[in-house]
Amino acid sequence: MNNHSEAESSGHGDNDTIPGWNEELELAFSAYKGSYVPGRVASRHKTVCDVLLPAAVVQAGISGALQKIGKQPVVGDFVVVLDQPELGSRMIVNILPRKTCLSRGAAGDGGGEQVIAANIDTIFIVTATGKDLNLRRLERYLAIVYSSGARPVILLNKIDLEDNPIRLVEKIQSIAGNVPVIPLSALSKTGLEALSPHLNPGETVALVGSSGVGKSTLINSLLGETVQRTGGIREDDEKGRHTTTVRQMFLLPNGAVLIDNPGIREIQLGDSAEGIEKAFSEIVDAASNCKFKDCTHRDEPGCAVLKAVKDGIIPEERLASYHRLTDELAFQSRKSEIGLKRLEKERFKKIAVDIKKYKKSTGKL
């Protein structure tokens, strides 16, 4: 947790002091005794995590056993820490069950998903007036957030730079459905009071959005102090300079928890099929009246979605965006399958090499 110094004493204490801790987590942790303490990951570095324990904020490594099975703690995770300060050792040995996961498609050729934050109740999708406002990008974010299990809220920042912000709010609302859209200025603190219903004590809120939309300024305004460096606005492209380098967790004065995520540079979909359906609910609703159950809504006869587009009920660009995201999801799935097959092939190849080495060493070749 930001603004805490590492305590010299043991991290043992009242578990309820860990933000977001509840009875379900207490039950999950009850099997651990002795030097094991619960904690919550506040920020993640390459090989260590900053972990909020009941009575201290410490740096803890990640056990080899966790790494071997591919379990990686992320910001927001509730974890089990083997706390042995007298030996100079603190190690994350397990991750308690996650109630929500914010994921995205992993970068690179292997496909798959990358979890970037966990145990989030609400996600603020932050955009800004000017060139950053992109409805297609917001649709992507909505699909990702819906898939996480968290509640989405869209924040339109920098309204002080816009003559008619209500027009932009209506534009965003046209693709957001029932998702709240809140106009504000983090710099002048205009409209921040509208965030109160979404910042409840003990709940966790994460901020996502592209670089330069003002997330750091928003955090500073909500905390009432400068804890995140901001980069100002470049006049040539109306964007703030990208400044956040690691995810961090902050405790607001009312007891709500705020997680800041760096601007997602590669907004790829993970396993977001359900999220896409929720983000494009009007298309899914219309599809229930299609002639064919496996209709792709491209050129099939009797397609109710294409009819809705023709009748002006569904905007053509919405359907085009839906197709782009579903095509991308299918591509990601194929890429992931290819990656798994490659790993399986490499595993069998290694087994064959090991068998050959064994036979050679025992003279059975």
Curated annotation (Swiss-Prot):
What Gene3D superfamilies is this protein classified in? P-loop containing nucleotide triphosphate hydrolases, Probable gtpase engc, domain 3
Classify the source by domain of life. Archaea
CP-type G domain boundaries: 112-267
Task: Enumerate the subcellular locations listed in this protein's record, separating them with semicolons.
Answer: Cytoplasm
| One Pfam family from the record | RsgA_GTPase
Single GO MF descriptor = rRNA binding
Q: What is its EC number?
A: 3.6.1.-
Give the matching CDD domains.
Answer: YjeQ_EngC
The coenzyme or cofactor needed here is: Zn(2+)
- Residue sites binding Zn(2+) per the record: C290, C295, H297, C303
Alphabetized, the UniProt keywords read:
Cytoplasm, GTP-binding, Hydrolase, Metal-binding, Nucleotide-binding, Ribosome biogenesis, RNA-binding, rRNA-binding, Zinc
Q: Which PROSITE patterns match?
A: ENGC_GTPASE (PS50936), G_CP (PS51721)
Entry keyword annotation includes Cytoplasm: yes
- Which EC class is this protein assigned? hydrolase
Give a Gene Ontology cellular component term annotated to this protein. Answer: cytoplasm
Biological process (GO), any one? ribosomal small subunit biogenesis
For the ligand (GTP), the binding residues are: N157, K158, I159, D160, G209, S210, S211, G212, V213, G214, K215, S216, T217
Function field: One of several proteins that assist in the late maturation steps of the functional core of the 30S ribosomal subunit. Helps release RbfA from mature subunits. May play a role in the assembly of ribosomal proteins into the subunit. Circularly permuted GTPase that catalyzes slow GTP hydrolysis, GTPase activity is stimulated by the 30S ribosomal subunit.
Family affiliation = Belongs to the TRAFAC class YlqF/YawG GTPase family. RsgA subfamily.
Q: Which HAMAP family match?
A: GTPase_RsgA
- Subunit structure, interactors included: Monomer. Associates with 30S ribosomal subunit, binds 16S rRNA.
What is the protein named? Small ribosomal subunit biogenesis GTPase RsgA
According to its UniProt entry, this protein's organism is Methanosarcina mazei (strain ATCC BAA-159 / DSM 3647 / Goe1 / Go1 / JCM 11833 / OCM 88)
What gene, per UniProt, encodes this protein? rsgA
